[in-house]
């Protein structure tokens, strides 16, 4: 009885199909031993079948390849920022995201500036500038799109031509009192200045293209066009607030000018460093001291200094201040801030009207973020 049970077990076991990977060669039609056994050989799966009284391998079918298990890429948790947590990575990223979102949603405007080119200007260099300028035009178009807008491009050697063109277009009001265009073209070698303003009521900027299109020079066109937006809404009042005027122009200038090649913000970091080192030592000392009152005085521009020193300081610290406001409160709020300047030139009252806090409060929150950007 025990022997009979054992034989039945062996018979049943032989009927169970087994799947395996064979190291020996499998030939269709050759003898196999276990009915319905499946064996993978090369790229096929062979099954042991019954043919008459014999067990043989069938022709096989293409083996199913195992689908690799993909590990889902974890979604990075956004850095939470607030007026009390101005994270050094989160703030630049959020501000940039807010600006680029607006840029991407802005259609290409069918609108071109009138261009006046000096005799020494190379067209290829102008084309480089226009690419960045068009981004600024599209970006500001929902708020600022003048009926006419003109750009004057010059190079070294175009001094006499520019003086004549200035008389024709009425550009002398753009210059500081007592200066000439020739003086500005000779301040730097090669010249790379730019100025925005109005020529007989037409929004205009003048730019010398003496330096290659790269680095900080990519922000010049969007920077100057931002000044025209400021003039349109802020009138003359915005010029009484240097960190706003130059700071917001420099911020939107580099964000639009460096896009889309600065995803890691390396250009931003290098640009900030160059702006810092362009400040005079007195301004740098105020920031290095990390003294809150000296910081507030510098933001309010109470420390005496020339127009150039105020501008140099405004580029650096104003760019950081603008970045913080755009990151925390968005782009539309910043436009509202600019519009409010036309009727409210007092910074403390202006911040209160737009953002709900006064000047001292903002500077106290901003200071650690600014100090953290002092190059080591």
Feature map (PLM): residue ranges:
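Extracellular disulfide-bonded cysteine-rich modules/repeats
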Residues: 42-50
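Zinc-dependent metallopeptidase catalytic helix centered on the HExxH motif
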Residues: 190-284
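Non-catalytic architectural context of zinc metalloproteases
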Residues: 76-214, 218-219, 356-363, 370-374
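Sec-dependent signal peptide cleavage junction
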Residues: 16-25
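Bacterial N-terminal signal peptides
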Residues: 8-16
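Positively charged n-region of N-terminal signal peptides that target proteins for export
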Residues: 1-4
């Amino acid at each position: 009885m025990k022997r009979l049970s054992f034989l039945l077990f062996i018979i049943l076991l032989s009927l169970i199909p087994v799947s395996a990977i064979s190291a020996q060669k499998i030939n269709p039609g050759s003898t196999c031993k276990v009915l319905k056994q499946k064996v993978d050989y090369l790229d096929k799966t062979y099954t042991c079948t019954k043919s008459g009284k014999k067990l043989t391998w069938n022709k096989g079918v293409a083996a199913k390849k195992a689908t690799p298990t993909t590990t889902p890429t974890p979604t990075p948790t956004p850095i939470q920022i607030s007026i009390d947590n101005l994270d050094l990575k989160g703030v630049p990223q959020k501000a940039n995201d807010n600006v680029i979102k607006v840029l991407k949603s802005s259609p290409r405007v069918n609108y071109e500036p009138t261009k006046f080119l000096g005799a020494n200007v190379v067209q290829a260099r102008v084309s480089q500038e226009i690419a960045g300028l068009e981004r600024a035009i599209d970006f500001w178009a929902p708020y600022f799109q003048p009926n006419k807008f003109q750009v004057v491009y010059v190079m070294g050697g175009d001094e006499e031509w520019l003086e004549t063109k200035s008389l024709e277009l009425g550009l002398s009001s753009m210059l500081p009192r007592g200066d000439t265009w020739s003086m500005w073209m000779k301040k730097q070698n090669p010249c790379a200045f730019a100025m925005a303003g109005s020529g007989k009521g037409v929004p205009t900027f003048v730019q010398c293209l003496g330096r290659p299109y790269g680095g900080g020079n990519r922000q010049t066109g969007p920077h100057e066009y931002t000044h025209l937006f400021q003039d349109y809404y802020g009138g003359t009042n915005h010029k009484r607030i240097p960190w706003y005027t130059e700071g917001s122009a420099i911020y939107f200038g580099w964000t639009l000018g460096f896009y889309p090649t600065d995803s890691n913000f390396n250009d931003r970091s290098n640009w900030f460093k160059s702006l810092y080192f362009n400040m005079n030592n007195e301004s740098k000392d105020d920031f290095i001291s990390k003294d809150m009152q000296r910081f507030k005085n510098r933001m309010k521009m109470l420390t005496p200094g020339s127009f150039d020193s105020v501008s140099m300081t405004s580029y650096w610290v104003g760019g950081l201040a603008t970045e913080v406001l755009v990151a925390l409160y968005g782009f539309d709020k910043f436009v509202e801030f600019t519009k409010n300047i036309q009727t409210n030139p007092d910074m403390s009252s202006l911040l209160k009207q737009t953002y709900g806090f006064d000047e001292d409060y903002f500077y106290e929150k901003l200071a650690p973020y600014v100090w953290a950007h002092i190059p080591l």
